[in-house]
């Protein structure tokens, strides 16, 4: 509610409402929708190691229960489960499921997902240092950690990618590599919050 009030319609607000409990994730999603969120970011159920059929059911139940777009979040290093390309293809049939923040680092799966899913199912990089590579495979940009500290640079990188200027995007991506690594020198979000604190 505080974020929605502060933004005051100037930008879309996407609320993170994921949980390893379908019931809890649905309740959080409905609360966020009531608070005015424009969309929802839903991580895969962590710890439980759901099957692909279980993931489909989990996300479909939540998508059925709200009237705002959902972005799925695949981050197997944190959750212990990966969303398969075929699972994305099934979930993409739901009108409220619009894309994925892909932080799995599996470029073969990303290619297969792009081939199996309709064009309006968006893929965003979930790893700053993979932004250009994912955009080359049909991604739409990045849901970024680094942009909290270097917004102009990450905006420029995304613009170059969306213009298909991958020569310039690749150079900028390489220039940002050390900074991207520094933002993960400890468990996220400790480094980025420390950097923001240093910036005042």
Regions found by a protein language model. Name each.
Residues 197-198:
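GST superfamily/GST-like fold recognition
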Residues 188:
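Interdomain hinge/lid region at the active-site interface
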Residues 64-65, 78-184:
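Catalytic alpha/beta core domains of metabolic enzymes, predominantly
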Residues 1-80:
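Active-site beta->alpha loop and helix N-cap motifs at the rims of alpha/beta catalytic domains
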């Amino acid at each position: 509610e505080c974020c929605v009030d502060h933004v005051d319609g100037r930008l879309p607000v996407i609320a993170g409402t994921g949980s390893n409990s379908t019931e809890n994730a649905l309740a959080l999603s409905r609360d966020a929708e009531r608070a005015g969120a424009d969309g929802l970011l839903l991580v895969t159920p962590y710890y439980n190691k759901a099957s692909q059929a279980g993931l489909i059911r989990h996300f479909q139940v939540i998508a059925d229960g709200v009237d705002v777009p959902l972005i799925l979040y695949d981050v197997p290093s944190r959750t212990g489960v990966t969303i398969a390309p075929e699972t994305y293809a099934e979930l993409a049939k739901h009108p409220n499921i619009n894309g994925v923040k892909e932080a799995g680092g599996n470029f073969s799966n990303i290619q297969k997902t792009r081939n199996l899913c309709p064009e309006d199912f968006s893929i965003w990089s979930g790893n700053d240092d993979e932004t250009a590579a994912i955009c080359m495979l049909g991604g739409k940009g990045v849901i970024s950690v680094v942009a909290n500290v270097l917004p102009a640079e990450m905006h420029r990188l995304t613009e170059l990618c969306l213009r298909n200027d991958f020569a310039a995007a690749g150079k900028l991506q390489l220039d940002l590599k050390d900074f991207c690594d520094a933002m993960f020198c400890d468990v996220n979000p400790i480094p980025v919050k420390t950097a923001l604190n240093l910036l005042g």
